[in-house]
């Protein structure tokens, strides 16, 4: 018989830097999960990734207080900011452009995020990433 799911907890945690302080501690402590056990498992799973990169994670908490978790790819906005070399997107993306990304960079980001995105082909995923870039005030160059 399958375990009974008590809750799903969605967080963004820096790769390799999970610790019991907020946001991890309160979110998991509320569900009665062993926080240090999660932190060790998460840090072990994300040690190959760039340290500090925000990683979305979905934690499934079961009635017996055990848990499983699934890590996703970093948000497109974070990857675009890194590729363009900017701190943050534009406050007025239709008027102020803050940086540039090439189509090759967009393709690379789309390939990185392919598992977490909908869309049949890499081209449709690239269009989605390019749209995110434009809404952040980045210019997509051919």
Curated annotation (Swiss-Prot):
GO terms, biological process = translation
Q: What are the recorded GO MF terms, alphabetically? A: large ribosomal subunit rRNA binding; structural constituent of ribosome
Q: Which domain of life is it from?
A: Bacteria
Q: Which Pfam families match?
A: Ribosomal_L11, Ribosomal_L11_N
How is the polypeptide modified once translated? One or more lysine residues are methylated.
What's in the GO CC field? cytosolic large ribosomal subunit
Signal sequence segment: none
- Keywords, in A-Z order: Methylation, Ribonucleoprotein, Ribosomal protein, RNA-binding, rRNA-binding
According to its UniProt entry, the function of this protein is described as:
Forms part of the ribosomal stalk which helps the ribosome interact with GTP-bound translation factors.
Of which family is this protein a member? Answer: Belongs to the universal ribosomal protein uL11 family.
Subunit: Part of the ribosomal stalk of the 50S ribosomal subunit. Interacts with L10 and the large rRNA to form the base of the stalk. L10 forms an elongated spine to which L12 dimers bind in a sequential fashion forming a multimeric L10(L12)X complex.
**What name is this protein filed under?**
Large ribosomal subunit protein uL11
């Amino acid at each position: 018989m399958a375990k009974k799911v008590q809750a799903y907890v969605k967080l963004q945690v820096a790769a390799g830097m999970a610790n019991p302080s907020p946001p991890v501690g309160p979110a998991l402590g509320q569900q009665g999960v062993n926080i240090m056990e999660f932190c060790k498992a998460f840090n072990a799973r994300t040690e190959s990734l760039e340290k500090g990169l925000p990683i979305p994670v979905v934690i499934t908490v079961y009635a017996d207080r055990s848990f499983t978790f699934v890590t996703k790819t970093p948000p497109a906005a974070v990857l675009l900011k890194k590729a363009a070399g900017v701190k943050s997107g534009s406050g007025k993306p239709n008027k102020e452009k803050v940086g540039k990304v090439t189509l090759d960079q967009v393709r690379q980001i789309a390939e990185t995020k392919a598992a977490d995105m909908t869309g049949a082909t890499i081209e449709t995923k690239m269009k989605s990433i390019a749209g995110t870039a434009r809404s952040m005030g980045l210019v997509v160059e051919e």
